A protein has these predicted regions:
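Generic detector of intrinsically disordered, low-complexity, polar/charged segments
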Residues: 12-14, 41, 56, 182
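Sec-dependent N-terminal signal peptides
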Residues: 2-13
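Outer-membrane pore/translocation modules
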Residues: 68-78, 85, 100-224
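Outer-membrane beta-barrel initiation region
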Residues: 19-124, 135-138
């Protein structure tokens, strides 16, 4: 299935977090500032901040929309097709807040993150302009600052997160999974590089068999900081 996004307008262009798919963001803070790794950047706890990109696209075109979702687990395969349009809107909201500061020798922090992505059939009056899919992604994140110079740059942090993703649907359209995501942050000049490998948590009632074959076992995010 070939997809591309046409961004007609942005409610907000945010320079935080990771890049997803083909989203374009402008980085205004360094990796260290976004995660408050240095003492000078500490802002305390329970301050709501942007996390991943926040955006809205008025037009997203899919050549072959998934009208009848299927799974390798037969209990999670739709039995009927839905009359989805090829064009829909899409938006994402994402925030984080620090809940514990200065753990483990006064340096580690615990954050709570939440991301919600919606695919909206706003142009489809036949189904009352319903949401085709809404994905919810809460996570608990631990970050610990490090300073290790390598290749004229510096490793800035290590950490991990407990991540849950779900579409909040009932059978047979329910999709959810859990994983542990590891974080390694590196800065060189104005470039920020984050390596995020993950391990999937076992699930006795597997809704997504072999999901890592489709989305992989990690991601690398590269961003540039405009001074």
């Amino acid at each position: 299935m070939y997809k591309f996004s046409l961004i007609l307008f942005l409610l907000s262009s945010i320079a935080f977090g990771q890049e997803n798919e083909n989203d374009t963001i402008i980085i205004t803070k360094t990796y260290s500032q976004r995660w408050e790794l240095n003492d000078a950047d500490k802002n305390g706890t329970f301050r709501l901040m942007s996390y991943k990109p926040i955006y809205i696209t008025a037009g997203r075109i899919s050549s072959y929309p998934n009208k009848q979702p299927k799974s390798e687990n037969p209990d999670y395969s739709a039995t009927e097709s839905s009359p989805y349009n090829n064009v829909e809107a899409k938006f994402q909201l994402s925030f984080k807040t620090k809940v514990v500061q200065d753990l483990l020798w006064g340096k580690g922090d615990i954050w709570i993150g939440y991301t919600q992505k919606a695919h909206w059939q706003i142009y489809n009056s036949d189904i009352s302009r319903a949401f085709r899919e809404i994905n919810y992604e809460p996570e608990i994140i631990f970050r610990y600052p490090v300073k290790m110079k390598v290749f004229n740059g510096e490793f800035k942090s290590i950490g991990f997160a407990f991540n849950h993703q779900s579409n909040g649907r009932d059978l047979p359209l329910s999709r959810s999974w859990n994983r542990i995501i590891f974080h390694i942050g590196y800065e060189i000049d104005n470039w920020n590089i984050t390596l995020n490998p993950w391990i999937r948590s076992s699930d006795s009632d597997d809704e997504n068999p072999n999901i890592t074959k489709y989305i992989g076992n990690g991601e690398i995010n590269v961003s540039y900081n405009y001074n």
